Amino acid sequence: MGVTLDLARAPAQPLAPSRPNLSGMTRAELAACLVELGVVRPEKAKMRASQLWRWMHHYGVTDFEKMTDVAKETRAALAEVCAISRPQVVERQVSKDGTRKWLIRMAPGIEVETVYIPDVGRAGALCVSSQVGCTLNCTFCHTGTQALVRNLTAAEIVAQVQVARDDLGEWPSPKEDRRLSNIVFMGMGEPLYNLDNVAAAIDIIADNEGIAISRRRITVSTSGVVPELAALGERTQAMLAISLHATNDELREKLVPLNRKYPIAELMAAIRAYPGLSNSKRVTFEYVMLKGVNDSPAEAKALVNLLKGVPAKINLIPFNPWPGSQYECSDWGTIERFAAVLNRAGYASPIRTPRGRDILAACGQLKSESEKLRASARRKLAAGG
């Protein structure tokens, strides 16, 4: 594991500049801002916004002086009244398996963790957060022990992608052989409780003249906020993942308390009606394997029956341990037998290889350990260490 920044030496600093940060604005917001600031005339706002957009999101430029096709006097005017800012990277960790994790400070006291998971070859996925903390209290998830602070803005969601691109050296946006090829909203928070900002961020990330990651390579994972599922599909055209983990209400209510509000029957009805659902646009069901809890052959058969007729694949996730958890991971043989039942029924059911466990970057491990480390650093500083 490599840690490149010391938390004890990274005091809180305000992210928000005194000037507007253009980096996370939509195209329309960007054009309107340029007019409001008096940088361009209204009739030229759309053209100038397109120029800036390409420099910011295709080339990753943060310095107006590098925008060579923008007039010199316009560059100077932009630098005086606005900014292109990145959030502060408080800590960067690299796992022995190549997984990278960044602790990113969006504003004083507003910090999230973002994880890059390399795949075979050059491809890889970026796991982004949508909220600071979480309200769902899923009992197997370490993130759920962190109380919700607030939603992230669209700019703060996009900033996670920009930070990763900076670190991976992927500017300008490559057309092929990308190291960062997929985006998964599987970090901190419930994306559907922040749908407006998630949808706006996806619009920016998917724009073909910018970061240009296809919507078919963007997956939004939800624990099942049923009233927002249709809107998610209509507004984002993103791939859908469901954090399921159980096949009956009694067990799922223990694992995912949100099930008390939106039980499985309601959830499955909303999934079957998800816009664009087809064999080429399957739903991914996430199923964490908990020893003696949800890993029996009977549960596997019940899962097959539950998903009957739904174009789906099932990701089996070995439980990633964290301090104080009441659960253990299922034995590997048990997981393989569970997968075999699903495979025989015709469902792709890959067993997710745990990645980044040594830096607490694996599924369900985010955030809380960083909080402990920061608290320890504060105590050390207070003691004069």
From Swiss-Prot:
Active site: 113 (proton acceptor), 363 (s-methylcysteine intermediate)
Matches recorded under Pfam families: Radical_SAM, RlmN_N
Class of the enzyme per the UniProt entry, highest EC level: transferase
Example of a GO cellular component annotation carried by this entry: cytoplasm
Residue ranges constituting the Radical SAM core domain according to the UniProt record: 120-352
InterPro entries noted in UniProt: Aldolase_TIM, Elp3/MiaA/NifB-like_rSAM, Methyltransferase_A, RlmN_N, RNA_MTrfase_RlmN, rRNA_lsu_MTrfase_RlmN/Cfr, rSAM
Residues that, per the record, bind [4Fe-4S] cluster: 134, 138, 141
One record GO biological process: rRNA base methylation
PROSITE patterns according to UniProt: RADICAL_SAM
Cofactor binding summary note: Binds 1 [4Fe-4S] cluster. The cluster is coordinated with 3 cysteines and an exchangeable S-adenosyl-L-methionine.
Subcellular localization(s) per the UniProt record: Cytoplasm
Keywords: 4Fe-4S, Cytoplasm, Disulfide bond, Iron, Iron-sulfur, Metal-binding, Methyltransferase, rRNA processing, S-adenosyl-L-methionine, Transferase, tRNA processing
Disulfide bonds: 127-363
EC number of this enzyme: 2.1.1.192
CC cofactor: [4Fe-4S] cluster
Record GO terms (molecular function): 4 iron, 4 sulfur cluster binding; metal ion binding; rRNA (adenine(2503)-C2-)-methyltransferase activity; rRNA binding; tRNA (adenine(37)-C2)-methyltransferase activity; tRNA binding
Catalytic reaction(s) noted: adenosine(2503) in 23S rRNA + 2 reduced [2Fe-2S]-[ferredoxin] + 2 S-adenosyl-L-methionine = 2-methyladenosine(2503) in 23S rRNA + 5'-deoxyadenosine + L-methionine + 2 oxidized [2Fe-2S]-[ferredoxin] + S-adenosyl-L-homocysteine; adenosine(37) in tRNA + 2 reduced [2Fe-2S]-[ferredoxin] + 2 S-adenosyl-L-methionine = 2-methyladenosine(37) in tRNA + 5'-deoxyadenosine + L-methionine + 2 oxidized [2Fe-2S]-[ferredoxin] + S-adenosyl-L-homocysteine
Keyword Repeat carried by entry: no
Record carries keyword Cytoplasm: yes
HAMAP family, sorted: RNA_methyltr_RlmN
Record's function text: Specifically methylates position 2 of adenine 2503 in 23S rRNA and position 2 of adenine 37 in tRNAs. m2A2503 modification seems to play a crucial role in the proofreading step occurring at the peptidyl transferase center and thus would serve to optimize ribosomal fidelity.
Note in the entry: Reaction proceeds by a ping-pong mechanism involving intermediate methylation of a conserved cysteine residue.
Family the entry assigns: Belongs to the radical SAM superfamily. RlmN family.
PANTHER family in the record: 23S RRNA METHYLTRANSFERASE, RADICAL SAM CORE DOMAIN-CONTAINING PROTEIN
The name this protein goes by in its record: Dual-specificity RNA methyltransferase RlmN
Organism this protein belongs to: Phenylobacterium zucineum (strain HLK1)
Gene coding for it: rlmN
